């Protein structure tokens, strides 16, 4: 089965057959909002990613919303022709109750049941599909309803200012709320940054230097 593309994961020249744009968000739980459409069917490389996402798909007369978790490795995927997508990418540590990122990891996506052409079922209620322009309003409703939440310990850990927790407790919080370990999270971030640099034709030696690939991590890093 082909997987619909997540725009921020495109690493080939998307101008060939996929056109997309993104924007920043002022919502504290949202990292970015994306949308794209495809002119024809082709393949794309879905690179490793740490994010939890909600992706709205319009394809062949159908509309549906899919929940996606982190991807720990890159995968060559099929992109269908004449599809449209809107994607909400959440900040690390944000998750939906009942659909933890670990359960969605590595293409174990969950498509929520449609209620109509404009809405879907979630927790017994029919909700309108989000759009590129009203994504924040959609997320605010989910947060207010207690459906989407965020673990502040994840942000503290990434900022290297963990709360008064044992190492084991911090590790448990991080894994549960992101779906990956801290070490895996950092590896994925470095790989994604390296991909961006290589696309910008930065030399391999400069990429290695910028990423500090051979530099040992600090002794207090969470494994």
Give residue spans per PLM region.
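Alpha-helical bundle regulatory/interaction domains
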Residues: 1-167, 177-182, 196-217
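Short, basic, alpha-helical segments at the C-terminal edge of helix-turn-helix-like DNA-binding modules
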Residues: 186-196
């Amino acid at each position: 089965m082909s997987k619909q593309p997540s725009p921020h994961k495109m690493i080939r020249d998307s101008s060939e057959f996929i056109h997309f744009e993104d924007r920043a968000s002022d919502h504290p739980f949202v990292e970015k909002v994306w949308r794209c459409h495809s002119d024809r069917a082709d393949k794309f490389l879905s690179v490793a990613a740490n994010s939890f996402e909600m992706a709205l798909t319009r394809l062949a007369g159908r509309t549906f919303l899919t929940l996606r978790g982190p991807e720990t490795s890159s995968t060559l995927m099929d992109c269908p022709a004449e599809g449209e997508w809107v994607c909400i990418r959440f900040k690390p540590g944000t998750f939906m109750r009942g659909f933890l990122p670990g359960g969605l990891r590595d293409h174990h996506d969950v498509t929520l049941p449609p209620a109509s052409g404009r809405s879907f079922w979630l927790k017994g209620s029919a909700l309108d599909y989000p759009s590129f322009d009203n994504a924040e309003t959609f997320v605010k409703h989910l947060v207010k309803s207690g459906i989407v939440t965020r673990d502040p310990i994840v942000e503290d850990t990434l900022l290297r200012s963990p709360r008064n927790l044992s190492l084991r407790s911090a590790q448990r919080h991080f894994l549960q709320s992101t779906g990956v370990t801290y070490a895996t999270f950092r590896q994925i971030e470095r790989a994604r940054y390296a991909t961006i640099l290589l696309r910008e034709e930065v030399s391999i030696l400069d990429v290695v230097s910028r990423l500090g690939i051979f530099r040992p991590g600090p002794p207090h890093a969470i494994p």
